[in-house]
Amino acid sequence: MEDDAWLDLVGISADPPNRRNKCEKCKRPVVVCWCPALPHPPEAVSSQIVILQHPAEEKRSLRTALMLQLGLEPGKCVVYKGKRFPNHRNHADLQRILDSPQTLLLYPSRDSVPLEEVDHSAGPYTLVLIDGTWPQAKAIYASSPALHRLRQVKLIAVGISDYIIRTQPTEGCLSTLETAAQCLAVLESRPELRQTLVRPLHTLCKYQLDNGAVEHQSKEFLLKNNQYPKPIGKRLSRLLRNTACDGNEET
């Protein structure tokens, strides 16, 4: 009996189990590859997108920054990772970008101006985006003095996110891909560019919905409609009441 057990053990393969074949480009399993939805050839733009990515974003299973990188010509979207910028891994390259007068930072501060009002004829521009949750983005900004010197811009008309399989904080929150695509559509004066670059996200969401995922509403929507499953504090409750009152006055 014991000898048979040892024979069974010897017969077990030492090789790791076979995993699903993955696409070389998007690194997704082939059956859920969104590469066919990418623009072919990649979009040629004069602007450049620089993404400062919080390390936690790299762990997310559904990341959209790669969609942007593959949807644009090589070098038109670069990603730097960290919690403070520049850092020892990217100091020289990123510092040159941050020192350029043509570099803009998308950040909703008091000093930010609508991207639509920037003089597009003075371009091309490099647009810096911070990729992370809002608390992560604020922490990156606070710990990166080099970002404080950049001209700051914001998007006015953002609409509702198409990333419907992920819960967004508010109705106006967009994924990294959607944000960059909208900015490029403005900077390049090509409104159709947003839809073209976001197409892989639509493909991803459709596959997930077809295979059991559910469509998500934003936390703001759930809270305003008394559908949020967790208790909220008095401060947030008061803010929501005031927002509702302001909305009623406008209508």
Swiss-Prot record:
This is tRNA-uridine aminocarboxypropyltransferase 2. Zn(2+) binds at residues 23, 26, 33, 35. Belongs to the TDD superfamily. DTWD2 family. Pfam families: DTW. GO terms for cellular component: cytosol. One of its GO terms (molecular function) is tRNA-uridine aminocarboxypropyltransferase activity. It comes from the Eukaryota. The lineage of its organism: Eukaryota, Metazoa, Ecdysozoa, Arthropoda, Hexapoda. It comes from Drosophila melanogaster. The keyword Transmembrane helix does not apply. The gene is Dtwd2. A motif (DXTW) lies at residues 131-134. Signal peptide: none annotated. Its EC number is 2.5.1.25. It is an enzyme of class 2 (transferase). Contains 1 DXTW motif. Coiled coil: none annotated. It catalyses: a uridine in tRNA + S-adenosyl-L-methionine = a 3-[(3S)-3-amino-3-carboxypropyl]uridine in tRNA + S-methyl-5'-thioadenosine + H(+). Catalyzes the formation of 3-(3-amino-3-carboxypropyl)uridine (acp3U) at position 20a in the D-loop of several cytoplasmic tRNAs (acp3U(20a)). One of its GO terms (biological process) is tRNA modification. Keywords: Metal-binding, S-adenosyl-L-methionine, Transferase, tRNA processing, Zinc.
